[in-house]
């Protein structure tokens, strides 16, 4: 049993022994190979060292390296020497130039004293400046510039105590507030009374965020609307006490400027009244504390970079110690930010509120930079002479559409005269509309009859004339009519003939030309006489009614319209006469009954179309005149002779004659058809 246990242990020891022996053999082989390689390398090195050629080559390499290093050292030394020489030369030149510059003023002053004598006092009061552009002279490759100098008195330097005063705090003098407060090492000046009032931390609306994340809670429109409401309330209240020069609200994030309200009055009395009235009052749940500050120069109080960026930002951010103000609605008091006088429209507006001012505070020129003005800054203000100015944003927007921003106030007498004039025009226009309605009612019963009678009568007259010419001038019994009889019959059928008096018709008949004269000349003479008589009656009526005022002038216009309608009828008659002569020549050249019938039918259709177009034109003219009468300011009821001519009796007689002519025309047409069929 013990022998079996000892056999595995011996076998394990034998296995370990074999591995170790194999590992030892490998190590020995490696050591032998390394020793052999080292021995071979030593022998090769000894062989090379013993070779004379190899020794010579190594010596040559060492000598070449030594020569190269020597050349590099010599080149460096030469360059260093040259640089030192150049530096010494430059230093010598600079020293010489400095000596010349130091001696030049002494030489020039000595020469000037020799030329002008001992005028030291005059030299202190005068200086030499350039007069005009310099003269440039080209001489080959050289350019010579000559400047003309003139002697002028020296300008007095402006005293700037704010920058030169080291005792007083500059920020407190400029803005009336200092971030150090009572801990400031410089003097803070608090005046007993001043034209400028300061209300600290009065505005607490949006736009005063200390952290940038708080600005995300309100949009720019909400901030602008909130400040506009604050401006309307506070500015209106402070404007009650007197004229303002500037009104500013700070939007800085610093505690000493945050929400400060500055009110700069033009007069000291107004500032004192505002102080006594506003100090201790409550606004938005907080008590107002007013104090006087010596801030009168707003150009140095407001941040210039902030103003140039159009109320956007500056490089110092909200922690800037200069004023970052809200932009007033409508761009109010922007001129005061640059210490400039207000525009003329603002002066007129303040004069309307507080009366004209004799103070010359605005007598200095403007130095406002030309900045791009936004559209919203041009807000219009309504005209107002109320001593208690109460602005409203709604009224300003309405006034923006009606009035100019430079035209605000007129006197009370001028406005009252405009009001009375508008009232008179309204009353006259109402009375004139009533009169026009009465005229329209009186004349409406004739319009339909006139239109129908004119159309039917004109068509019948043209048909009658064409039939007469188509039959070669024959009458009812086949007799040939003379030109005189035909012209008389045409006169009896003209629409204007019924409106004439009996003596006028007799005169035309007695003065009618003989058969040898043409019908056109006879009609021209009668038309000329009728036109002269109508113009004489129209001018006489116009002179009688000329002095009756505005309503009478409109009545004359209506009567002239009736006269022009008569003239239009006369022009239509001349057209008919020309058509009759042309058609008579055409029918004579044809010579056949069929041709005459064809031409009569076509001409009748043409005449009917012309009469329809003339009737449509007259209807449009009457409609236009009636529309103009409704839009006119004044209308007067007048008795017109032309209206009396359109009475019912006249139209009844004309319709009776037209019926007789129509029956005659039908009988002739039947006879012509029967003769043609045969």
Curated annotation (Swiss-Prot):
Sequence ranges assigned to domain RRM in this UniProt record: 195-295
Q: What InterPro entries does UniProt report for this protein, alphabetically?
A: Nucleotide-bd_a/b_plait_sf, RBD_domain_sf, RRM_dom, RRM_dom_euk, U2AF_small, Znf_CCCH
Biased composition (Basic and acidic residues) is annotated at: 35-45, 68-77, 93-119, 367-386, 393-444, 451-492, 529-550
For this chain's UniProt record, which GO biological process terms are given? Answer: mRNA splicing, via spliceosome
CDD domains hit by this protein: RRM_U2AFBPL
Domain of life, per UniProt, equals: Eukaryota
Check the record and name the Gene3D superfamilies matching this protein: 3.30.70.330
Could you state one GO cellular component term attached to this entry? U2AF complex
Q: Where are the zinc fingers (C3H1-type)?
A: 163-191, 297-327
Region listing for Disordered, in residue ranges: 1-77, 93-128, 358-678
Annotated Low complexity bias: 1-15, 605-616
Q: Which GO terms describe its molecular function?
A: DNA binding; pre-mRNA 3'-splice site binding; zinc ion binding
**Biased-composition ranges for Basic residues?**
19-34, 519-528, 665-678
Q: Does the keyword Signal apply?
A: no
| Polar residues composition-biased segments | 571-591
Instruction: State a single Pfam family of this protein.
Output: RRM_1
Question: What UniProt keywords are attached to this protein's entry?
Answer: DNA-binding, Metal-binding, Repeat, RNA-binding, Zinc, Zinc-finger
Question: What name does the UniProt record give this protein?
Answer: Zinc finger CCCH domain-containing protein 16
Q: Which organism is it from?
A: Oryza sativa subsp. japonica (Rice)
């Amino acid at each position: 049993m013990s022998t079996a246990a000892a056999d595995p242990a011996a076998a394990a020891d034998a296995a370990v022994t074999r591995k170790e022996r194999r590992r030892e053999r490998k190590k020995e082989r490696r050591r032998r190979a390394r020793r052999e390689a080292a021995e071979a390398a030593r022998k090769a090195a000894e062989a090379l060292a013993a070779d004379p050629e190899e020794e010579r080559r190594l010596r040559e390499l060492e000598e070449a390296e030594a020569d190269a290093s020597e050349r590099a050292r010599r080149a460096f030394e030469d360059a260093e020497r040259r640089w030192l020489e150049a530096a010494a030369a430059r230093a010598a030149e600079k020293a010489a130039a400095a000596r010349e510059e130091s001696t030049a003023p002494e030489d020039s002053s000595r020469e000037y004293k020799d030329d002008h004598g001992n005028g030291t006092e005059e030299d202190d009061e005068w200086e030499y400046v350039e007069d005009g552009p310099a003269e440039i002279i080209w001489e080959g490759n050289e350019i010579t510039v000559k400047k003309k100098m003139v002697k002028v008195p020296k300008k007095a330097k402006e005293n700037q105590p704010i920058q030169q005063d080291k005792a007083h705090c500059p920020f407190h003098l400029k803005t009336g507030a200092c971030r150090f407060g009572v801990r400031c090492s410089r003097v803070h000046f608090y005046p007993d009374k001043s034209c400028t009032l300061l209300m600290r931390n009065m505005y607490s609306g949006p736009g005063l965020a200390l952290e940038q994340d708080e600005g995300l809670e309100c949009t720019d429109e909400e901030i602008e609307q909130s400040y506009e409401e604050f401006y309307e309330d506070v500015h209106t209240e402070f404007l009650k006490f007197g004229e303002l020069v500037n009104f500013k609200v700070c939007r800085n994030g610093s505690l000493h400027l945050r929400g400060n309200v500055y009110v700069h009055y033009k007069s000291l009395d107004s500032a004192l009244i505002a102080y006594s009235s506003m100090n201790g009052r409550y606004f938005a749940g907080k008590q107002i504390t007013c104090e006087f500050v010596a801030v009168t120069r707003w150009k140095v109080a407001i941040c210039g970079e902030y103003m140039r960026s159009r109320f956007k930002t500056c490089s110092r951010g909200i922690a800037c110690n200069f004023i970052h103000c809200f932009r007033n609605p409508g761009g109010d008091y922007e001129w005061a930010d640059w210490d400039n006088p207000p525009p003329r429209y603002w002066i007129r507006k303040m004069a309307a509120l507080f009366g004209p001012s004799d103070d010359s505070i605005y007598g200095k020129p403007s130095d406002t930079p030309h900045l791009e003005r936004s559209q919203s800054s041009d807000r219009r203000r309504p005209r107002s002479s109320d001593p208690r100015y109460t602005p409203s944003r709604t009224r300003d927007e309405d006034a923006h559409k009606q009035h100019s921003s430079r035209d605000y106030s007129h006197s009370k007498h001028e406005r009252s005269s405009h009001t009375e004039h508008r009232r008179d025009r309204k009353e006259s226009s109402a009375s004139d509309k009533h009169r026009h309605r009465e005229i329209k009612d009186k004349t409406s019963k004739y319009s339909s009859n006139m239109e129908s009678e004119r159309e039917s009568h004109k068509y019948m007259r043209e048909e009658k004339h064409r039939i007469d010419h188509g039959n070669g001038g024959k009458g009812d019994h086949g007799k040939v009519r003379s030109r005189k009889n035909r012209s008389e019959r045409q006169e009896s059928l003209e629409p204007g003939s019924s409106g004439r008096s009996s003596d006028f018709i007799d005169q035309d008949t007695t003065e009618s030309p003989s058969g040898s004269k043409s019908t056109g000349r006879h009609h021209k003479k009668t038309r000329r006489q009728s036109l002269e008589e109508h113009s004489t009656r129209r001018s006489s009526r116009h002179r009688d009614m000329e002095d009756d005022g505005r309503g009478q002038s409109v009545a004359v216009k209506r009567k002239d319209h009736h006269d022009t309608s008569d003239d239009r009828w006369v022009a239509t008659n001349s057209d008919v006469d020309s058509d009759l002569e042309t058609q008579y020549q055409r029918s004579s050249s044809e010579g056949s009954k069929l041709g005459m019938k064809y031409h009569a039918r076509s001409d009748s259709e043409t005449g009917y179309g012309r009469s329809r177009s003339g009737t449509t034109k007259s209807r449009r003219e009457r409609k236009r005149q009636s529309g103009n009468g409704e839009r006119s300011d004044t209308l007067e009821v007048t008795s017109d002779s032309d209206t009396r001519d359109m009475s019912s009796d006249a139209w009844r007689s004309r319709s009776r004659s037209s019926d007789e002519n129509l029956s005659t025309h039908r009988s002739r047409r039947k006879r012509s058809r029967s003769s043609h069929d045969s």
